[in-house]
Regions:
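Conserved C-terminal helix/tail region of periplasmic/extracytoplasmic solute-binding proteins
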Residues: 262-286
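Short, surface-exposed recognition loops or helix-turn segments adjacent to catalytic cores
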Residues: 128-137
Length: 286
């Protein structure tokens, strides 16, 4: 019997997906690398993919756009997403970003919300810097190396690549906000692929347990995918305790939007997260 295929779009392959792909019982994953969160939004609206792996804040922002407004986070695939604000040499503190062009994926949703909150906390006015859309993490690194912009948020291994090229670490999202959540799986509630996504969550849960119990096998899966051992170990360290999105992380995303006066500040956990697939397919209770 042929395996079912799930269509998923992401910036970089998440650890659990790489580990799950080694399991013969797993679904076939048709993965599509995207260059921006707008590509993810458009693909979900058009029904070209079944789910995306992305910043959970995107689900909040997308539900405020013209369109279906039925996006929900159905799982969380990492404990947190490590994000480093990388800048040109000589700009090693946030006050040095006044007047700077800062490269982002999108100006109103995603990881940019945490970035804006950090700048706000540092007392940098919203008219004292410019957010310049430059695409996903790889695209932002390429733009930074091409001397476009002054700073951007990067995750591993892209932050290390920027530092090796002469840029400096300016700030860490995790140091500012320890409860910052990892990437989530976002889908539309009206999607016909609900059962398919649920079956994929079963695959990811088996992978999560394997990472926890047999990290050496998880490391091998990552290295086999072409990533260095250091990247594998970093991913393994961020293995979540559960696929259920954390209430603390979601609350932080809402708090950031409230502090910044962004749409979605009146959201609550059920408006952002549909954890019923985790309950139905994995058996976890809230």
């Amino acid at each position: 019997m042929d395996k079912q295929t799930i269509r998923v779009m992401w910036f970089v392959p998440p650890l659990l997906a790489m580990v799950a792909a080694q399991d013969r019982r797993s679904l076939v994953t048709q993965s599509i690398r995207n260059r921006s969160s707008d590509e993810q939004f458009n693909a979900l609206v058009a029904g070209e993919v079944d789910a995306v792996v992305t910043s959970m804040d995107n689900g909040i922002g997308w539900n405020r756009r013209v369109g279906p407004q039925d996006f929900r986070v159905v799982a969380q695939v990492e404990r947190t997403t490590p994000l480093i604000l990388v800048a040109r040499a000589g700009r090693s503190n946030m006050s040095a970003l006044r007047g700077a062009d800062i490269l982002v994926d999108a100006p109103d949703n995603g990881f940019v919300t945490a970035l804006r909150a950090m700048l706000d906390d540092a007392g940098i006015g919203r008219d004292e810097y410019r957010l310049v859309p430059a695409g996903g993490v790889q695209e932002r690194l390429e733009a930074l190396l091409a001397r476009q912009g002054v700073a951007t948020l990067l995750g591993p291994p892209f932050d290390a690549m920027a530092v090796k090229a002469g840029f400096v670490r300016n700030a860490s999202v995790q140091e500012h906000y320890p409860d910052f959540p990892g990437q989530g799986i976002v889908m539309r509630t009206g999607s016909r692929a609900r059962s398919l996504v649920g079956a994929w969550l079963e695959d990811l849960e088996r992978a999560r347990q394997l990472v926890q119990e047999r990290p050496a096998l998880a490391r091998q899966a990552v290295v086999s995918a072409g990533l260095p051992v250091a990247a594998a170990d970093g991913m393994i360290a961020l293995n979540p305790q559960s696929l259920r999105p954390t209430s603390e992380g979601v609350a932080l995303l809402i708090a950031h939007r409230r502090a910044l006066g962004l749409a979605g500040a009146d959201s609550d956990y059920p408006a952002i997260v549909d954890d019923s697939l985790v309950h139905e397919h994995i058996g976890e209770k809230a």
